[in-house]
Amino acid sequence: MADSSFDIVSKVDHQEVDNALNQAAKELATRFDFRGTDTKIAWKGDEAVELTSSTEERVKAAVDVFKEKLIRRDISMKAFDAGEPQASGKTYKVTGDIKQGISGDDAKKITKLVRDEGPKGVKTQIQGEEIRVTSKKRDDLQTVIAMLKQADLDVALQFVNYR
């Protein structure tokens, strides 16, 4: 019998993040408590979002609005890393990064967790920014998926190519 396998990845649907950003921008433009504060949200490059406002409290509230929209679009908060508000002239600015891919350190943590706590006979391989998990039994793979979903990791994980 052939080995079964799946891949562990950390990817964010760019279109869903864009939809959340547009919804947040619309809410910031129409909400009463943001009137006159010149609060804006926009892309900064491909993987970062920039929020600006006239006060520190308003920019923090804008970050909360954006996080709420991300949650409604089923995007994990582990994939969004908002920095601290920084004063620049008369405005405050927050830059948040959209994290994609599994870093080398996180990949090592995940493979060590699977090796130590997972069922015997499960093998892991780090392949760039994803991890391949193989086993002779599909039940073992499902056990590994359940274990990783319960684990408190710093990365939003998705499980793809289950075969």
Swiss-Prot record:
InterPro entries: DUF520, UPF0234-like_C, UPF0234_N, YajQ-like_sf. One of its GO terms (cellular component) is cytosol. It comes from the Bacteria. One of its GO terms (molecular function) is nucleotide binding. The keyword Nucleotide-binding applies. Keywords: Nucleotide-binding. Belongs to the YajQ family. Nucleotide-binding protein. This is Nucleotide-binding protein MMAR_0920.
